Amino acid sequence: HIRSFNSNGMVAIKDKEVMPMDVDRVIETARAMPIPADQEILHILTQEFIIDDQDSIREPIGMSGFRLEVKVHIVTGAVSAAQNIVKCVRRCGIEVNDLVLQPLASSYAVLSEDEKELGVCLVDIGGGTTDIAVWTQGAIRHTSVIPIAGDQITNDIAMALRTPTREAEDIKCRYGCALSQLADAEEFL
């Protein structure tokens, strides 16, 4: 129920110096993409600004020019799924300020600014989904939520070995290895 895509927008700079309202306007032009009625925008993440073909600008306010462009990463989610999450949390007596895409939250929690600047792909293999966030030059370039994860691996082990799920989970946790160079060449599974 999560989708993401990159977009861009462009506006003329009104007073030849970029003001906050120019930034707001250019981001609005970038978000003017057709989005299905069952989806809502969760995030508009700025990647970079461009002023008169000068790219890689992070903070354009106060700079001079005639044309302001922006590149953004837009994340949308299913309206009903978002509403159900908010309802569930509110029923627990907690107010929801905002919804945050899980790979984005993980990125903020575990990645350093240097990693995001140099380029990194965060892969979080959970129980039900594998979440991906790709960063370069300090900006998020791609996000994805894939509905294949640890539970699927456990089920595959259970089917292949004809063993109960509980035992398959134990096998996965004890002997599973995501990096081939860390696996023992003498072991076979």
Describe these PLM feature segments:
Residues 136-137, 147:
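A short beta-strand motif that forms part of the nucleic acid-binding face
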Residues 1-122, 139-141, 150, 161-189:
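Nucleotide/phosphate-binding catalytic cleft detector across ATP-hydrolyzing
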Residues 143-145:
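Residue-level detector of high-confidence beta-strand sites
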Residues 127:
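Short, glycine/acidic-enriched loop or turn micro-motifs at the edges of active sites
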Residues 131-134:
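Short beta-strand scaffold segments in enzyme catalytic cores
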